[in-house]
């Protein structure tokens, strides 16, 4: 588990690289990458936190979710963007099943309209029920879990993009590929 300082830095980086690069005047390329040295210089000048390569490596090593990738002289958020970016990986055949955790309130809309990206570029799908439950529990104490017929959806022209953190991205998914599993209780 990360200490509070690293969590705060990680959340700030996520906000900048996923949603608001303009707060530091960062320019993201089409894949969401920005210059590492520029980010560090502006981050350290603007925030009351210290960021360097060692700090980022500690965040990456201690986090169960791989949120960031250092690629040569650039850094990017791996997924979760609300600013328009292209997936780094080509569309790939997904596993037979993927999963999505959500709130009961959202589930009523999802059952009719399918999965839509809402304020993001892509819908995020998990490779396992436990991760979907964890994601859904952020929005509802008893999240609704959907099992996605991913391979069937792919055969019907839906493109799936894998990430390095066992999250799959899809632009949207019609309701016919979703199977309501159940509501899960958050474990103590």
From Swiss-Prot:
SUPFAM superfamilies hit by this protein: ADP-ribosylation
Molecular function, one GO term: tRNA 2'-phosphotransferase activity
Checking Pfam families in the record gives: PTS_2-RNA
Domain of life assignment: Bacteria
Per the record, the GO terms for biological process are: tRNA splicing, via endonucleolytic cleavage and ligation
Q: What class of enzyme is it?
A: transferase
Task: Give the E.C. number(s).
Answer: 2.7.1.-
Keyword NAD included in the entry's annotation:
yes
User: What is this protein's function per UniProt?
Assistant: Removes the 2'-phosphate from RNA via an intermediate in which the phosphate is ADP-ribosylated by NAD followed by a presumed transesterification to release the RNA and generate ADP-ribose 1''-2''-cyclic phosphate (APPR>P). May function as an ADP-ribosylase.
- Could you tell me what this protein is called? Probable RNA 2'-phosphotransferase
Species? Lacticaseibacillus paracasei (strain ATCC 334 / BCRC 17002 / CCUG 31169 / CIP 107868 / KCTC 3260 / NRRL B-441)
As recorded in Swiss-Prot or TrEMBL, the protein's gene is named kptA
């Amino acid at each position: 588990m990360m200490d509070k300082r690293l969590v705060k830095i990680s959340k700030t980086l996520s906000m900048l690289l996923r949603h608001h690069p303009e707060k530091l005047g960062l320019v993201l390329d089409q894949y969401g990458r920005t210059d590492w040295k520029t980010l560090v210089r502006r981050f350290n000048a603007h925030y009351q936190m210290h960021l360097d390569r060692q700090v980022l490596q500690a965040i990456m090593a201690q986090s169960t979710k791989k949120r960031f990738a250092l690629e040569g002289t650039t850094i990017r958020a791996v997924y979760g963007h609300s600013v328009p970016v292209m997936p780094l990986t080509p569309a790939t055949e997904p596993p037979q099943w993927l999963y999505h955790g959500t709130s009961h309130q959202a589930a009523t809309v999802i059952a009719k309209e399918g999965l839509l990206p809402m304020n993001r570029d892509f819908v995020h799908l998990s490779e396992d029920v436990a991760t979907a439950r964890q994601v859904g529990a952020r929005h509802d104490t008893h999240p609704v879990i959907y099992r996605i017929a991913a391979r069937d959806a792919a055969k019907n022209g839906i493109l799936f993009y894998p990430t390095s953190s066992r999250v799959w991205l899809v632009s949207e998914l019609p309701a016919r590929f979703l199977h309501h599993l159940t509501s899960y209780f958050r474990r103590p």
